[in-house]
Amino acid sequence: MGRLIILGNGFDLYHGLPTSYKNDLVPILKELNSDLFEKLNKLYFEENIDLWSDFEKQIGRTKSLDCLNSPIIDKLLYLFNIDAISYPPESENYGNFWLEFEEARHEAESNRVHLETVFSEYHSDLDDVKEFFREGLKQMCKCANEANNKKNYLNKNILFSDNDYFISFNYTNTLEKIYPNVSKSNICYIHGTIEEEELIFGNLSENIVDTTSDLNEENEKYCKSDIKGCEIHVKQEFIDNVTYEQEEFDQYNENVVAYMNQLNMSMIKPIQIKRLKKFLEKLDIKKIYIFGFSMGKVDLPYFEMIYDLFPKAEWFISVYNSSTMIKENIEESKFEKKIKYLKTEKFLEKLNRNF
């Protein structure tokens, strides 16, 4: 009887490894580059997230660009500042508003803010976002693999057969390290491992294109004249008294939107359907066990394909606290009614009984 066992991050956490997004990855990212982390947090994550699936669901879906424009707005606010030019009472020019005005305009013109240059100065780090996350993941998984080498798992609680096949969504070597009877040829690391391949992560293209606030022209809610949360709204004196044209600000706003669209599109996860199909197509699977996986919508295409290949298989999934989130994620999927939800202890009992 063929068994397919699908492992998520909960499998590593079950074995006591430091692979939590909030508790383990976030501190590493902050240590790597705290400024970039805070910027990305403001761009994509309105509030703290706990799960890796939440991270993938949000990455590439811009919430606000205020944090990108604030350095430029600060410079503009101090660009044309008459108060800074005011003459002291002892000066013969004290109270000469028009002279102060002209001095302020001259000073502003001499120190004119070049919008694109300032944006590049403050935000060039965004060009390395994917590598930033990859490096954080590699460091976290390296720590987890080192922990694997040090731990003594005399009581593993899980029985795997030599004939079991595995799909691991993890980047660690936990499965083959702790369960040496599992052949590496029976494992598909669908998103890579830190030892062998580039780590794969990201969001679905339809999430990024269809729900990126009002920043994307392919979004039906996009309105070029009303790009919420990203325009620099300029006081009229910047245009009247310094040689700025409204078109310069309009062009800057459009360039920022285009840049962010490009950045967001780079966050699309390349779904490895062909790779998974090649791994599975010659197997005869009767039972499917899903352990430690929250069934994030980003990864549902894999499960739809698994259902197509093995429509008669029984499905079981482990539930840590509540099944509500999983049920919401797989709502209206092909396999929605196939899944049987079991608390972790009951799930492992069933898995071991069918060993």
Locations of regions flagged by a protein language model:
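Glycine-rich, phosphate-binding/catalytic loops in enzymes
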Residues: 21-25, 183-186, 306-308
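Short amphipathic alpha-helical segments and helix-helix/interface helices
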Residues: 26, 151-159, 176, 276-280, ...
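Short, conserved aromatic-histidine micro-motifs
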Residues: 30-43, 315-324
